[in-house]
Amino acid sequence: MSGCPFMGKKHHFNFSELSLEDKNEDSSQEGLNKASKGGLIYGDYLQLDKVLNAQELQSEKKGNKIHDEHLFIVTHQAYELWFKQILWELDSVREIFQNGHVRDERNMLKVVTRIHRISMILKLLVEQFSVLETMTAMDFFDFRDYLSPASGFQSLQFRLLENKIGVPEILRVPYNRRHYRDNFKGETNELLLKSEQELTLLGLVEAWLERTPGLEEEGFHFWGKLEANIFRGLEEELQTVKTKPDSEEKEEQLAELQKQKELFGALFDERRHEHLLSKGERRLSYKALKGALMIYFYREEPRFQVPFQLLTSLMDIDTLMTKWRYNHVCMVHRMIGSKAGTGGSSGYQYLRSTVSDRYKVFVDLFNLSTYLVPRHWVPRLNPSIHKFLYTAECCDSSYFSSDDSD
């Protein structure tokens, strides 16, 4: 049975029965065709003559037109257009941070909105693989040889995106035992070098986190109070477990408490953090990590709600970039198996090596969940810091700056 309430019944509307008066009273026809008077029109504004004529099939040029090459080209052009939009949003966010505009909390919503927009675009790009996968491996094989030596690795915009977000150069997987920039020449190589020298989103967020209110030792001193509370809590739990009769469960609980003690001992050891930072296992400075954890614990306070959303959106970007890499790996494996890539790389093997935490920029934010503790262990806010976090102010020099930005 159809879900349409009109199925099986005759419902005809006789437009010829409309009177001239009814037709004249049709408000849907009261508009004005401004285009008839000349000026900018849709196709000109979007320069569709350029966009829609930019699909040049190499197979057709060689006299062997392959239908699915058109899909391959359009899909990758769409990726590049979206990469351009991501870079547009990312550059604007970096500019807001660089100019100190985040000190004015009114601009934080702008930052979060644009970062969230980036994550939504990345989500779309992850899903876009499903369109490309409607092409079979044999369909791709039919025109693959026409592409060489072109390769997705040569996407300048994707490499710029990685650099501007903050993928560490030293953690990149070598491309055929060479520096990734060696695959780019002239102006493109210079653009990549310039992007490596600019302040990254990671570095700018790090500096912002270091200014988190409440970290000052002469003030609320969140870090010192948290350390004292955690080790006091662990000691109390240890004494409670020790009173229990000997059993396998007791031994397991004692072992777990020892692990927790070592875990938090490492967290509060600044020298250990610096060591992990030098090895690339941590990305944020010690002070920035303190700020991130404080925002995490007090995220319900009005002043920390938007910063917490920002940290969440930054993790979303990392997650979606990882998903994009993974989907890319799966698609390449499906299309070419273990063959070499068109650009000369090992193909699937190389791409698989990039799906790791080496390419995660905000990995420290993911690891914050490691340090969750019972709520009553979190230092209680004193009246001064509670009042400070309860009200967001414009132009507050202690945390967030007075100039507006675009």
Curated annotation (Swiss-Prot):
Keyword vocabulary terms for this entry: Dioxygenase, Heme, Iron, Metal-binding, Oxidoreductase, Tryptophan catabolism
Record field: catalytic activity: L-tryptophan + O2 = N-formyl-L-kynurenine
SUPFAM superfamilies: Indolic compounds 2,3-dioxygenase-like
Protein name: Tryptophan 2,3-dioxygenase
Pathway assigned in UniProt: Amino-acid degradation; L-tryptophan degradation via kynurenine pathway; L-kynurenine from L-tryptophan: step 1/2
Iron is among the record's keywords: yes
Family: Belongs to the tryptophan 2,3-dioxygenase family.
Entries under PANTHER family matching the protein: TRYPTOPHAN 2,3-DIOXYGENASE
Subunit structure: Homotetramer. Dimer of dimers.
GO molecular function: heme binding; metal ion binding; tryptophan 2,3-dioxygenase activity
Cofactor note: Binds 1 heme group per subunit.
